[in-house]
């Protein structure tokens, strides 16, 4: 949990499947490599590495449950039949003044808002037809499953005032530039 006087900031990246969260975060990670003000969190997931999926650490269900029980996660949640966790070490990064960036589920936004006084929620979105096309190109779901997934999507801005939305329907370069601009703004405010 974050101290009362935070030095860094937690940036929670959310958005629907197919919006391009990993693509934008990967590009930002490359652009910011070597800049110690920024730390991209590597998620821990109960799934083995597969081509075409995000780079993550894997734990089986039993080891994940044990790690959660031992308090080794800053946050953890369940989605799409898998369990996801963020390592507790991210709190040390924030305490040290870093802008910590993590891909999270909207289900944990209330926990993030409760635990981290210095935070930003970045919603990566795209038009529905763009999402459908991207999900279809992955080849992991049927047309019906994609339609059901898109029907479940809801808005992410709940009026709390900490949300920035980036529309990634077009060129990913423009979306990445907007994301980097936001991260640099946070870093300037954090250091000031």
UniProtKB/Swiss-Prot annotation:
Reactions this protein catalyses: alpha-D-ribose 1,5-bisphosphate + ATP = 5-phospho-alpha-D-ribose 1-diphosphate + ADP
Catalytic class of the enzyme: transferase
InterPro entries membership: GK/Ca_channel_bsu, P-loop_NTPase, PhnN
GO molecular function annotations of the record: ATP binding; ribose 1,5-bisphosphate phosphokinase activity
Protein's pathway: Metabolic intermediate biosynthesis; 5-phospho-alpha-D-ribose 1-diphosphate biosynthesis; 5-phospho-alpha-D-ribose 1-diphosphate from D-ribose 5-phosphate (route II): step 3/3
Organism superkingdom: Bacteria
Signal sequence interval, chain numbering: none
GO cellular component: cytosol
Protein's UniProt keywords contain GTP-binding: no
GO biological-process terms attached to the record: 5-phosphoribose 1-diphosphate biosynthetic process; organic phosphonate metabolic process
E.C. number: 2.7.4.23
Alphabetical keyword list: ATP-binding, Nucleotide-binding, Transferase
Family according to the record: Belongs to the ribose 1,5-bisphosphokinase family.
Role description: Catalyzes the phosphorylation of ribose 1,5-bisphosphate to 5-phospho-D-ribosyl alpha-1-diphosphate (PRPP).
Official protein name in the record: Ribose 1,5-bisphosphate phosphokinase PhnN
Annotated source species: Brucella abortus biovar 1 (strain 9-941)
Organism classification: Bacteria, Pseudomonadati, Pseudomonadota, Alphaproteobacteria, Hyphomicrobiales
């Amino acid at each position: 949990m974050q101290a009362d006087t935070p030095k860094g900031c937690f940036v929670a990246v959310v958005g629907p499947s197919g919006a391009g969260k990993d693509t934008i975060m990967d590009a930002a990670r490359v652009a910011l490599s070597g800049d110690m003000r920024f730390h991209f969190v590597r998620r821990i997931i109960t799934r083995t590495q597969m081509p075409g999926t995000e780079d993550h650490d894997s734990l089986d269900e039993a080891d994940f449950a044990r790690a959660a029980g031992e308090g080794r996660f800053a946050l953890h949640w369940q989605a799409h039949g898998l369990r996801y966790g963020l390592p507790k070490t991210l709190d040390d990064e924030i305490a040290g003044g870093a802008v910590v960036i993590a891909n999270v589920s909207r289900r944990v936004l209330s926990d993030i808002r409760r635990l981290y006084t210095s935070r930003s929620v970045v919603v990566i979105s795209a038009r529905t037809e763009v999402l459908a096309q991207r999900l279809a190109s992955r080849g992991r779901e049927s047309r019906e499953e994609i339609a059901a997934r898109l029907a479940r999507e809801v808005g992410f801005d709940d009026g709390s005032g900490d949300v920035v939305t980036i529309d990634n329907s077009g060129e990913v370069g423009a979306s990445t530039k907007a994301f980097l601009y936001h991260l640099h703004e946070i870093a300037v405010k954090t250091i000031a």
